[in-house]
């Protein structure tokens, strides 16, 4: 019976808290199976457009689990392409309105616990390897905001409302 549940992506859920800077995995009974520190988007608030450096909030699903060991990334800091920027894996999420958002490893373990990414959810590489062992396409990922994200979103909505009424 447990083996059958292990094969169902919906039998587990990943919950990412931008408030606690934690990624937790729960089973269908609500038992916490894993708990890791993360880094998330540099900017506060809900993701509204590509390049805003925000981690999207809401319910998403794992699309693919990809080998990222040979991938590089240019962080725009003058150092050029960084080998291993994504760690060993990239767990691609289905995030409508955004592309390239996922859960991945890091070349910079000291960034965990900070707002350091361009929107992705970053883990230590050992934690990511453990997480990948149970992740399956179709698995649900819930990303929840921090209080600061919520306040930033309220300002964003207020500014948009004001700009529409002042036209």
What are these regions (language model features)?
Residues 37, 64, 122, 142-143:
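Structural signal for conserved beta-strand scaffold positions within catalytic alpha/beta enzyme cores
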Residues 89-94, 100-134, 140-142:
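Active-site scaffold segments
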Residues 1-101, 149-151, 157-162:
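Gly/Pro-biased beta-strand-loop elements
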Residues 29-34, 109-110, 138:
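Short, surface-exposed beta-strand-loop junctions and turns on beta-sheet-rich folds
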Residues 127-167:
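N-terminal targeting pre-sequences for secretion and organelle import
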């Amino acid at each position: 019976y447990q083996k059958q549940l292990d094969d169902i992506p919906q039998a587990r859920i990943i919950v990412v808290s931008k408030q606690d800077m934690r990624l937790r995995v729960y089973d269908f009974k609500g038992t916490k199976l894993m708990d890791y520190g993360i880094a998330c988007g540099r900017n506060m608030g809900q993701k509204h457009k590509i390049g805003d450096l925000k981690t999207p909030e809401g319910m998403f699903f794992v699309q693919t689990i990809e080998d990222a060991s040979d991938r590089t990334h240019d962080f725009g800091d003058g150092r050029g392409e960084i080998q291993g920027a994504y760690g060993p894996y990239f767990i691609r999420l289905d995030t409508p309105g955004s592309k390239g958002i996922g859960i991945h490893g890091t070349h910079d373990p000291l960034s965990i616990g900070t707002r350091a990414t361009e929107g992705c959810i970053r883990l230590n590489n050992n934690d990511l390897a453990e997480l990948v062992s149970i992740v399956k396409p179709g698995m649900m990922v819930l990303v929840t905001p921090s209080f600061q994200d919520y306040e930033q979103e309220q300002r964003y909505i207020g500014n948009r409302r004001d700009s529409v009424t002042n036209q």
